[in-house]
UniProtKB/Swiss-Prot annotation:
It holds the Pfam family GidB. Its main location: cytoplasm. This is Ribosomal RNA small subunit methyltransferase G. It comes from Thermotoga sp. (strain RQ2). The keyword Thylakoid does not apply. Gene3D superfamilies: Vaccinia Virus protein VP39.
Amino acid sequence: MDSVKNILLEYGLRFQEPQIEKVDKYIEELLGVPYNLTAHRDLDSAVHKNVVEILLPLKEELKGTLLDVGSGNGVPGLILAIFFPKLKVVLLDSREKSVNFLRGVIEKLDLGNVSAVKERAENFSRERREEFDYVTARAVARLNVLVEICTPALKTGGKLLFYKGPSYIEELKEAQRAMKELKVELEEVREYSLKTGERRALLILRKYESSPEKYPRRVGVPFKRPLL
C-alpha cells in the first residue's frame, strides 16, 4: 500500500513535509470514523478521493477566504486549508455529527486557519453575504442548486469552485437560468483523470455582480424547486 507522500509524488503534486504529516493524521481520522461518514476503507482510495482529486486541477495559489458548503468529512475545504495556509476556511455543514468530526480534526491537526459551523447553507449564505473570495463544494447537489445556495456568500469578483464528475455538461445546461439569476458566469472547466481511471472536472464560475437579495430562497426550496 502506497504512502500519502508517494501517491502525491506520482502525480507531481508539490508539498511540504508538515503538510504530509497533517494529511496522514487526517486520513487516519477519516478511516477511523463510522463508514456512514466516509465510503473509503483503505488508504489508497482515501488519498485519491480526498486529496489528489482536490489538488490536481489547481494551478494557482489560493489565498483569502473560502467557504466549503456541505463539507461532510472536510473535503475539499480541509485539504485546501492544509495545502494553502494563506486561506482562511469555514467548513459548513448542517449535520451535527459531521461538524463534531470536523472540529475534532481541526483540533488534532492544529489548524488555526479553519473553523467548522453547523448551519444550513441557505441561512448561512443569507447572513454572510458577499464575505468570501471562494466558495467550494463537492457531492452536495446539482449545479443549479449549488449556484443558488453558494453564490450569495461570494464576493463580487469571487469564484465558485465546484468539483464534478463527467455529467457536468448536462448540469451546466440545466444551470443556465440559475447562473443568470445569481449573476455568475462560467470562467473555466478543468477536466482531469485519476490513475484509478476516474474522470473529474473542476468548474470555475466567477461572480460578476451582486446577487439579488431574494436569493437564496428559504431553507429547502432550492432543493425542492430548483431554478430551471
